[in-house]
Amino acid sequence: MDLMCKKMKHLWFFLLLVAAPRWVLSQLQLQESGPGLVKPSETLSLTCTVSGGSISSSSYYWGWIRQPPGKGLEWIGSIYYSGSTYYNPSLKSRVTISVDTSKNQFSLKLSSVTAADTAVYYCAR
């Protein structure tokens, strides 16, 4: 029984260790903004505003994902606050992600949209 208590203490310590960063970041909020609809061949432009923390105060990447109707999530790309970008190879030629640390925002531009780009778009950290 004593051994079980020791194991439980270690488990709780581990859980607290894992959960602590999430408590600290729980106030962070991301809000997408942009047009609801874009016509074929046009450029989709979306902005994500970060509140509850500075976009440049952490070593995290900020990104965009999308979910087409009836399908799973698809990663579009990510950006570091310094401007380093990484894009989904299948979208790379049409995607630009940029960051504006003065406004605490990062943005997505997807050019030459088609019906295949129909999806719900999300910003994420």
From Swiss-Prot:
Out of the domains of life, which is the source? Eukaryota
The record's region (Complementarity-determining-2) falls at 79-85
Q: Where is this region: Framework-1?
A: 27-51
Where is the region Complementarity-determining-1? 52-61
Annotated stretches, region: Complementarity-determining-3 = 124-125
* Signal peptide per UniProt: 1-26
SMART domains per the record?
A: IGv
Record domain Ig-like: where: 27-125
Q: Name one GO cellular component term.
A: extracellular region
Residue span of region Framework-2: 62-78
Q: Which organism is it from?
A: Homo sapiens
Tell me the PANTHER family matching this sequence.
IMMUNOGLOBULIN HEAVY CHAIN
For this entry, the protein name equals Immunoglobulin heavy variable 4-39
Which parts of the sequence are annotated with region: Framework-3? 86-123
SUPFAM superfamilies associated with the record: Immunoglobulin
Assembly mode: Immunoglobulins are composed of two identical heavy chains and two identical light chains; disulfide-linked.
